[in-house]
Each structure stands twice: as structure tokens, then as C-alpha cells.
Amino acid sequence: MGKNLLQQRAGKGSPTFRNPGWLRIGKVRYPNIFGHFIGKVIDIVHNPGMNAPVALVKLENGTKFLMQAIQGLVVNQKIEFGKGSPIANGNVIEIGDAPEGTIVCNVEENFGDGGKYARSAGSYAVVVGKSGDRVLIRLPSDKIKAVSNKARATVGIVAGGGVIEKPLLKAGANYWKYKVKAKKWPIVRGVAMNVVDHPHGGGLHQSVSRPSTVSRNAPPGRKVGHIAARRTGRKEGK
């Protein structure tokens, strides 16, 4: 009898595969408040599972929240939050107030969603234009995205951009990188397994040696490969 596949073991819901959300220090997002406030950076901390450092900010009305730390941000720095804030590094502004060419990060799509775009370490977006009640921004992928002019964004570049410059040097470092993100690593190919471990395993060769397409209604132990694929392989020219 064959052994369970990786997705079958993960689907069981054991602690090995469960998301370690209890490690996180909190949600990194803007608070849903209106108006203009002066805030102060209380601390800059590490949030497990994130490469970018996180800044703990306290506003003058007593509200505390976590936001992406910006390059150049320091503890005890004063920042401004909300509509009417000047275009200065670390300030949270309404993106409709930003002129073209402004570098921003942690951009909301609509007011109140907490921030959706350019949130990872070293990333930023650029305001490239305005159209009615929408603001056009260029994302790190070079795609142009239209967001609400009431959406909030932080002026500057997310800190921690050099995280990919340091080499991992050994497999153990990569293991712990994925471990804190609750991702499976390393990924073993099915054709490299024994026949008891995977439908593509066995045979003393590194090939599937059978059709890799599988029905959408296949049972879990057989549902691997190209699931419900219309076609496989390279598309031939006309």
C-alpha cells in the first residue's frame, strides 16, 4: 500500500504544517481613523516571517499601530498621519495629495484596507498620474495600478532591501527561512521518489513514463501532476 502524499499530510492539519501565526507581533496595517494626527516612532522591531523591519507608532490620540519601517526612519522620530500631511519621508499621506514622481510604499487600494501594494523589504511604488478620483501608481513589477485618491500610503522606501544581498551559504539557513513562513522546503520531485511514495516514483529513471494529466475528480492519492489540463507541453506554432 502506498504512502500518503505531501498534500495529504498537510491537509490533515497537524502542527507541522500549521501557520505559526501566534509568532507574529500583530497586524501591520493602518488604523481606520479619519483626520490629521502627529505620531511618534516608539520602537523598530522584527516581526517573525517578515524581512522588513516594523515600526511601532503612537499617535497623539493614543492610537498605536504597526507599519513598515522606512529607510532612514529612527526611534523617537515624529511623523504625520492622515490628510494634509506634508510629503516627507515616513509620513502617511492620502495618495491623492502626492505629486507625480513621489515614491511611496504600503499603498492602499481603497481607504481602510490597511495597505496592499509595495509592502515587502526594499520595495516602493511611484505615482505616475491622476485620472478623476483615481491615482495611477507604478508597482515594483512595472505594472500600472489605479487606486483611490483617498487611499493612504507611506512616503519612502521600505527598509531591509539588502536582505537578498547576503548569501545563505548553507542549506540550514534556507531551511529556517522557510520554516518561519510555514512553507515546505526542500521540495522533492515525485520522479525522484520511490514507487511507494508517489505515483511518479520508481523505475530507476527520472521520468514520469506515463501520462501526467489527471482527472479533476481523481482521489487524493492519485491527484498529482497536470490536474485537469487542457493540454501539456510546448504550444506548436500554426
Swiss-Prot record:
UniProt keywords (A-Z) are:
Ribonucleoprotein, Ribosomal protein, RNA-binding, rRNA-binding
Record InterPro entries? NA-bd_OB-fold, Rib_uL2_dom2, Ribosomal_uL2, Ribosomal_uL2_arc_euk, Ribosomal_uL2_C, Ribosomal_uL2_dom3, Ribosomal_uL2_RNA-bd_dom, Translation_prot_SH3-like_sf
| Molecular function GO labels | RNA binding; rRNA binding; structural constituent of ribosome
Q: Where is the composition biased (Polar residues)?
A: 206-216
User: Where in the sequence does UniProt note compositional bias of the Basic residues kind?
Assistant: 223-238
Region feature (Disordered)? 201-238
Superkingdom of the source?
Archaea
In the UniProt record, which is one GO cellular component term? Answer: cytosolic large ribosomal subunit
Q: Which residues cross the membrane?
A: none
Q: Keyword Ribonucleoprotein on this protein?
A: yes
In the record, biological process GO terms are: cytoplasmic translation
What's this protein's family per the entry? Belongs to the universal ribosomal protein uL2 family.
Q: How does it assemble?
A: Part of the 50S ribosomal subunit. Forms a bridge to the 30S subunit in the 70S ribosome.
Give a short account of what the protein does: One of the primary rRNA binding proteins. Required for association of the 30S and 50S subunits to form the 70S ribosome, for tRNA binding and peptide bond formation. It has been suggested to have peptidyltransferase activity; this is somewhat controversial. Makes several contacts with the 16S rRNA in the 70S ribosome.
- Provide the protein name: Large ribosomal subunit protein uL2
Name the source organism.
Saccharolobus solfataricus (strain ATCC 35092 / DSM 1617 / JCM 11322 / P2)
User: What is the phylogenetic placement of the source species in the record?
Assistant: Archaea, Thermoproteota, Thermoprotei, Sulfolobales, Sulfolobaceae
Q: Which gene encodes it?
A: rpl2
